[in-house]
Amino acid sequence: MKSKEELFNMPIVELREYMNSLSNPEIQEVAKIFEEDDIERDPLELLTASKLFDYMKYANGSVN
């Protein structure tokens, strides 16, 4: 998995592609990194990563 610095320095298009390549537990780890960051980021930029919809279902217990 990429480091915090790598994630924050990725262009948004590359970050979306990276998010789509992760498993649900890995997405959860990345989400925690972004939650703990002091810099406010627009979460809507990542919503076009199609894998995030699957993760939201996973996080809410809808998907195993």
What name fits each language-model region?
Residues 1-7:
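Extended non-catalytic scaffold regions that mediate assembly and binding
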Residues 17-64:
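Acidic, low-complexity, intrinsically disordered interaction modules
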